[in-house]
Amino acid sequence: MNSGPLQQVTFRSFATADRDPLLKLWRACDLTRPWNDPEDDIRQCLANSSSALLIAEQDRRLCGSVMMGCDGHRGWVYYLAVDPDCRHQGVGRALMAQAESWMRERNVPKIQAMI
């Protein structure tokens, strides 16, 4: 387990090539359930202009994600995930800050986390 300050992490939008490593991350973080298809969640997110899926990378390796959506008044955070090898470095906190910024840009006054 790593611990210490946040190492160089970059944030960007999801790309098609992220699909397999992202699904692997979500499984490693125990975020998938048999009754909910995560690939369908990705498709719906990408098809909706009021949703976004951000990827965190460290040394060109996917180390985290956050999916968010809003209805104009309320925002939701889903699939907040940090690779177990990248935890305790501030990646999750930085992903939440990115989600909060995304919500502020859309004048969304409330955020709910789907856990």
What are these regions (language model features)?
Residues 103-115:
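Conserved GNAT acetyl-CoA-binding A-motif
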Residues 55, 61-69, 76-81:
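Conserved beta-strand in the GNAT
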Residues 8-22:
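A short beta-loop-alpha structural element at the N-terminal edge
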Residues 33-42:
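A short, aromatic/hydrophobic, helix- or strand-capping loop or linear motif
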Residues 88-101:
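Conserved acetyl-CoA-binding loop-helix of GNAT-fold acetyltransferases
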Residues 84-87, 113-115:
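Conserved beta-strand-loop-alpha-helix junction that forms the acyl-donor binding cleft
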Residues 43-55, 76:
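A short helix-loop-beta-strand connector motif used in the catalytic cores of GNAT acetyltransferases and
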